[in-house]
Amino acid sequence: MESNEKIQILSDLIQFDSRNGNERPVAEYLKALFEKHGIEAEILPLASDPDHRANLVAHVGTGKPVIAFTGHMDVVDFDRSQWATDPLQLTMDGDKMFGRGVSDMKSGLAAAAIALIDIKEKEIPFDGTLRFLATAGEEVGMAGSTALQAAGYMDDVDALIVGEPTGYNTSFANKGELNITLSAKGKAAHSSTPQLGINAIQELMDVWADIKTKLDERSQKDTNQYLGQDVYNIDVINGGSQPNILPANAEAQLNVRTVPEFDNEAVLAIIDQAIADFNTNHKGEVSREVTMEIIPIEGDLHSKLIQKMQAIAKAAVGKDIKAIAAPGGTDASKLLVDHPIGFPMAVFGPGNFLTAHQNNEECSKDMYLKFIDMYTELFTTVSTEY
């Protein structure tokens, strides 16, 4: 496949407005692309919205080992007025390519798809099966990867490659994440007689103070040598209607990033105990709801997969390739829910992570094309290690 065709495939993907909730057209495009080149692919609609949301699974080869690549088809939202170019058009400026998703992560998706096509058409020999998993909804909720894991598509996988943007590095671990809504019910009263009511905002402040104290104590003790410690913030708070009415209801949204040593379950246990203690000793009522959850993942830093990635990338770019831990989550947290520690998993993909989710998102054209070649070599050689 010529370079201009490789760029055109990425351009085609950028043109799909796949802001979370509209991934099926991307899946249909990839299915047609694969089938044009003799690769069988299957669209798997999501039950929640089958007309607009779907995963895609494709295979090349048969038998063991099974090497899986995963990448997501959705992108984050954008404001056209804040972009220097059309975010739904791939725009070139020298080596820079601009467009929503060009780094996160349609360049990785396109590069892996093209690598499979090259392997198929050139009949490059390899052992086992290459499985391509294109997911819906990674940016919000990870519904696609959750569905693929539940359907058994990870049951026989021996190693997992995640195509999120790392540039010329690779990542083997990421923090987990919890989004938690804290809700407080109080009693309205005139602000001049607060003793007649229950201030719901104050309830939240008191509960959060207790939660934070306990989280601080635990997080300082139970750290991870690669990921550090848990971090947590209240990012949204709502309550009250006007200055002279004691608020009867209040709500706060809490974001927590977790490490294996102080994981989601342990964090929720602390929060639940703090809420129970508060409700026992106060007239108001506080509750919590988990609105999003992914677990922390720690792959094997010394795996054959990472060693192979580092060797291939060093040969391509002439420098040592770092294996790092990342604070952000990926679909691996859902795909590896049954074995989150020690599995041969690595994140390795084209793009500039610093511009992901930003206005004027960009990716290097040279990096994108190099990753196609690196994926082709990786996909066809790493299977000998498993």
Feature locations, PLM:
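Acidic-glycine-rich active-site phosphate/pyrophosphate-binding loop
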Residues: 78-93, 156-157, 172-183, 311, ...
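Acidic/His- and Gly-rich active-site-bordering loop/insert found
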Residues: 1-98, 121, 126, 332, ...
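Metal-dependent amide/peptide-bond hydrolase catalytic core
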Residues: 179-386
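Fold-level recognition of mixed alpha/beta catalytic cores in primary-metabolism enzymes, strongest
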Residues: 102-103, 107-213, 359-370
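Glycine/charged-rich beta-loop-alpha catalytic/anionic-binding loops adjacent to active sites
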Residues: 87-101, 185-186, 314-317
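Residue-level signal for inorganic ion chemistry
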Residues: 13, 17, 34, 164, ...
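Short helix-capping segments at alpha-helix termini
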Residues: 37, 122-126, 153-154, 277-283, ...
